Curated annotation (Swiss-Prot):
SUPFAM superfamilies: Aspartate/ornithine carbamoyltransferase. The lineage of its organism: Bacteria, Pseudomonadati, Thermodesulfobacteriota, Desulfobulbia, Desulfobulbales. It comes from Desulfotalea psychrophila (strain LSv54 / DSM 12343). Pathway: Pyrimidine metabolism; UMP biosynthesis via de novo pathway; (S)-dihydroorotate from bicarbonate: step 2/3. Heterododecamer (2C3:3R2) of six catalytic PyrB chains organized as two trimers (C3), and six regulatory PyrI chains organized as three dimers (R2). This is Aspartate carbamoyltransferase catalytic subunit. Catalyzes the condensation of carbamoyl phosphate and aspartate to form carbamoyl aspartate and inorganic phosphate, the committed step in the de novo pyrimidine nucleotide biosynthesis pathway. PROSITE patterns: CARBAMOYLTRANSFERASE.
């Protein structure tokens, strides 16, 4: 990387805003933080005195917990607000909620919201750094970064790999962020799924679209399955889950077409027997739990980079 490079983003809205250098810098930073999670005492004073608010106005388990763990391991004061406990349930707008939080002078707000672009709207009204933890069907940058970290851990480099994503592409913010990220890093991205799950014109993003799952996984280095986002669909877009599993579920027979060293990924939650057979989810090549582990490291890196942590010297413990 250029020795003059400097990470200059105050906010993390999406992978689209990032350069290749930004992505590499985040992944390298996350790699240095990953070692902390292997220690007997999993804590460093990097963000001591900093305040992080996790504002999750849409249901989440993995992402919310991952950001909370990340903040605590960096010694930040972390506070969690969910949709059910926020004043938005009483009619308060997102901006008013954020302004009230801002009055308490947090250093960073991690936001999950059902509306695309919510993080950008928030950033126009408050001074704290905003990290997008998922906004509608727009982006989920930290998930894409942990996915890229997991792939890089397994192959050393992302460039030249074939990444096959199967499932509900149209309603998945993970898919969009992964497409942008892996493409920027030099991978070939293939998409497969029912026609109702593939956005029209998505080929313009530089991806290859397949109607045949078997062809999509041919020689693939990475096979990523996505769940059906029923909460974002007004009407059912497939005949049944059983038929979906038969036609698009990832099983051992299908993976015989992939590269010998193929890895299996899923952003979670996994619907076993639908998008992934249990023997695949738990079998050789599955790196689903590695994704979870890397998620903490990536989110530590993001919090450090936007909240102004100090990592100079041995005393910082990194």
């Amino acid at each position: 990387m250029d020795s003059t490079y400097c990470f200059s983003h105050k906010h993390i809205f999406g992978i689209e805003q990032m350069s290749t250098e930004d992505i590499v810098h985040i992944l390298d930073t996350a790699q240095s933080f990953k070692e902390i999670s292997e220690r007997s005492i999993k804590k460093v004073p990097t963000l001591r005195g900093k305040t992080v608010v996790n504002l999750f106005l849409e249901p989440s388990t993995r992402t919310r917990l991952s950001f909370e763990v990340a903040g605590k391991r960096l010694s930040a004061d972390t506070f969690n607000i969910s949709g059910s406990t926020s004043s938005t349930t009483k009619g308060e707008t997102l901006v008013d909620t954020a302004r009230n939080i801002e009055a308490m002078r947090p250093d960073a707000i991690v936001l999950r919201h059902s509306s695309s672009g919510a993080a950008q709207i928030l950033a126009k009204h408050i001074d704290a750094s905003i990290i997008n933890a998922g906004d509608g069907t727009h982006e989920h940058p930290s998930q894409a970064l942990l996915d890229m970290m997991t792939v890089r851990d397994n192959f050393g480099s992302i460039k030249g790999l074939i990444i096959t994503i199967i499932g509900d592409i149209a309603h998945s913010r993970v898919a969009l962020s992964d497409i942008i990220g892996f493409t920027k890093m030099g991978a070939t991205v293939r998409l497969a799924g029912p026609a109702t799950f593939i956005p029209m014109g998505i080929e313009a993003m530089g991806v290859e679209v397949y109607s045949s799952v078997a062809e999509a996984v041919q020689d693939a280095n990475v096979v990523m399955a996505l769940r059906i986002q029923k909460e974002r669909q007004n009407d059912p877009l497939i005949p049944s889950l059983r038929e979906y599993s038969i036609c698009y579920g990832v099983n051992k027979k299908l993976l015989e077409r992939a590269a010998d060293d193929v890895i299996i990924m899923h952003p979670g939650p996994v619907n076993r027997g639908v998008e992934l057979n249990p023997d695949v989810a738990d079998g050789k090549g599955s790196v689903i739990l590695d994704q979870v582990t890397n998620g903490v490291a990536v989110r530590m890196a993001l919090l450090y980079l936007v909240a102004g942590g100090n990592r100079n010297g041995e005393e910082q413990g990194v």
